[in-house]
């Protein structure tokens, strides 16, 4: 870190830059918790020191070819290349790290010992270990994916509006359910209402399905783990065989639900990465993350901020929360398996969300016609117990609900 600081100071003196001076750091004990929703700065011209090291802790293998870890690894390496960093020599990885406090701490210690300047931990269960490490290693930057903890100096969190992308994927599933004449849609999820992350994703997908096919029922089978390839396949098969589901979606790490869907002759919507290659006869589209959008911003801030303690101030917030408008989430290219009208509807709704005129969890629902056009209708947002979450015409629930306290399924969703 000392070498990095010296080099950065020299560069800034020569170029008369003052990147970290753009934002005043919060006073001790204070923190800016308002999420940054746009790119902090899209100018990637930044000195890339040869001794700058990026550390990453992955829950699955760095060699995965699809799914959650694959998407993060691709995002990190893409961002590094965009910034002039060399992943072959400047990326340090500890992979296949379970959500176990001691194992995560060991991975962090390894990366710090190898000289990492910034460490990304991509799994929710790493949260407490990263919080402790940020205090133990104040000269290192810690950035936690999908979490909510942070400090005012060297520790932030990042996530995004995945529910927006899932709504779009739900549109594809809804059109396909109508085409095949099957109102039963299945969903293999890591967890259900225990976590707002999974609940909001399931609800967003379901609302997209129901906007196209109001007679649909979405059956959810939960794994109790973020990754479990055996049961990811088994539960998809159960949803097909027991509940008669004709489309299978997922919130889990591998492509196994899509492969199971193909083997059973039905269709599916993946997650994290385009899974068409894994299940070319079944896959419709996937809700995906463009993780490089965030990783580029964070790495750039880490190289510009001079001291790790200035990182959060340089980022402008201790939390990053991007969506369709920032290009942080999206859907993968639609496959030839999609039904007529799907592309038109997804493009129209995507433009509506990006415009800021409408969002998913509001008291205004969309009714999507066969030609892909939509009508906006004031309607109560109701959970599957009949409770009104948002009254007809009301604004979207707050971000804090979507990321923290959404512990219900919307009407139309059933636990399998």
Question: What are these language model-derived features?
Answer:
Residues 22, 28-416:
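A residue-level marker of the well-folded mature domains of exported/periplasmic proteins
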């Amino acid at each position: 870190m000392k070498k990095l600081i010296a080099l950065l100071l020299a560069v800034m003196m020569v170029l008369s830059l003052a990147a970290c001076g753009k934002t005043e750091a919060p006073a001790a004990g204070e923190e800016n918790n308002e999420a940054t929703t746009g790119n902090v700065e899209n100018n990637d011209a930044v000195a890339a020191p040869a001794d700058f090291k990026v550390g990453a802790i992955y829950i699955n293998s760095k060699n995965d070819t699809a799914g959650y870890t694959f998407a993060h690894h691709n995002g990190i390496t893409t961002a590094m290349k965009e910034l002039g960093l060399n992943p072959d020599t400047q990326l340090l990885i500890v992979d296949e790290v379970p959500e176990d406090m001691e194992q995560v701490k060991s991975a962090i210690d390894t990366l710090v010992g190898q000289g990492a300047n910034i460490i990304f931990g991509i799994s929710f269960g790493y949260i407490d270990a990263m919080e402790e490490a940020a205090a133990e290693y104040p000269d290192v930057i810690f950035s936690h994916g999908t979490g909510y903890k942070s400090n005012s100096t060297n520790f932030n969190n990042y996530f995004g509006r995945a529910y927006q992308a899932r709504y779009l994927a739900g549109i594809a599933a809804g059109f396909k359910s109508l085409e095949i004449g099957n109102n039963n849609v299945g969903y293999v999820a890591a967890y259900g209402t225990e976590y707002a992350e999974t609940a909001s994703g399931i609800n967003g997908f379901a609302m997209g399905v129901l906007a196209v096919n109001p007679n649909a029922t979405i059956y959810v089978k939960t794994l109790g783990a973020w990754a479990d390839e055996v049961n990811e396949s088994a539960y998809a098969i159960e949803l097909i065989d027991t509940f008669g589901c004709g489309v299978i979606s997922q919130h889990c790490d591998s492509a196994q639900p899509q492969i199971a869907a193909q083997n059973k002759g039905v269709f599916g919507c993946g997650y994290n990465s385009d899974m068409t290659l894994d299940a070319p006869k079944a896959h419709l589209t996937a809700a995906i993350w463009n993780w490089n959008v965030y990783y580029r911003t964070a790495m750039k801030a880490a190289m510009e901020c001079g001291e790790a303690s200035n990182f959060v101030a340089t980022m402008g917030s201790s939390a990053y929360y991007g969506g369709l408008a920032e290009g942080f989430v999206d859907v993968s290219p639609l496959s030839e398996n999609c039904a007529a009208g799907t592309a038109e509807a997804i493009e129209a709704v995507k433009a509506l969300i990006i415009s800021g005129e409408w969002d998913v969890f509001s008291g205004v629902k969309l009714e999507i016609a066969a030609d892909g056009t939509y009508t906006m209708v004031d309607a109560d947002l109701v959970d599957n117990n009949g409770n009104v979450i948002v009254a007809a015409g009301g604004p979207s629930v707050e971000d804090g609900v979507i990321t923290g306290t959404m512990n219900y399924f919307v009407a139309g969703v059933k636990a399998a």
